[in-house]
Amino acid sequence: MAETTATPTQPVEKVSDVIKNYRPAKAFRGNPKADKQVNVTSLDFDDQGDYLVASGEDEMIQVFDVKEGKATKTVPSKKYGVHLARFTHHSRQILHASTKLDDSLRLLDLHNESYLRYFTGHTDKVVSLAVSPGTDAFLSCSKDDTVAFWDLNSRNAQGKLKLATPYLAAFDPSGSVIAIASQSTSFVLLYDFRNYDKAPFASFDLSPLEDRYTPTTKGRAWTRLEFSNDGKSLLIGTDYHGHFVLDAFEGNLKAFLVGKHGPTGRAAPVSTTGKSLGQGDVCLTPDGRYAIGGSGEQPDTLVWDLHQPPDAKLFLEPMTRLPYYRSRTTLAQANPRYNMFATADKEIVFWLPEDPTKMAEK
């Protein structure tokens, strides 16, 4: 792939004006020093969109400068393993889950490459991490069937919920509402974050939707839970058939996103197959209008326009397929500030909108 020196620009252009023009601008191996390529397992941007952090099966944490388009730091985590690397609201601090030794969460200072704090309390693997958009609070979901509520300034959990397979969690944009997905029961539960010890104020039963749209993977394929930035939609990504977009207030299905061809090859949190870890192959753009995701076993990246009406059965086809030939998309993450997004499988790819006139020349 020909690399470009183009850097992301602030979104003075509407996403709708450039969404069809995104092309791979730069690709990075998960770990350039490794003998062979390994799977990347998580991606996350900092609040300002200036840095991307990635974790991989090689137990390395990599940080990339988005503007410069280069890797700036690699930190090994061989002792504990690493998954779900997330920026706090400080771009020099990384929160991540452990994959071996114990099931603690760890807060890493990138400046001196040392751990500031361990968060202990889970007794099985952590499969989802959600950071509050406005405070130092965060949530963790574990295979011990608990959701733990934390503050970055304390090593002990502020509270816990015991639920059946609560393997995905997300904050709404205000930070006042949390969604928790219980895969085995096919429910999504909404809680007031300040009163999470009370009963959920809403619960959405997706069992009828799974029977209709994902019958062969019912109860075992949810991979992503994300609110749109306007708080009106809730995305539930799945590993195989497609993705659900719900009305975040009523739980009604807005659309089922189709167009994937086969699974991503990554394990859903509920899975016991031993497949490589991931965080879902679909995400929402910051304007809330588009979903970007993988096409399963094919290398193209799909884009769905959520403002377009679905068909009578609520199926929504991709508005475009963004071409790539070197690897498929098993992870996808949109930059919160700039017109760019990142995807990954065994390599990490930065996508930028290309000049339409140059595209025509090609």
Regions found by a protein language model. Name each.
Residues 1-362:
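WD40-repeat beta-propeller superdomains and closely related acidic/aromatic-rich repeat-like regions
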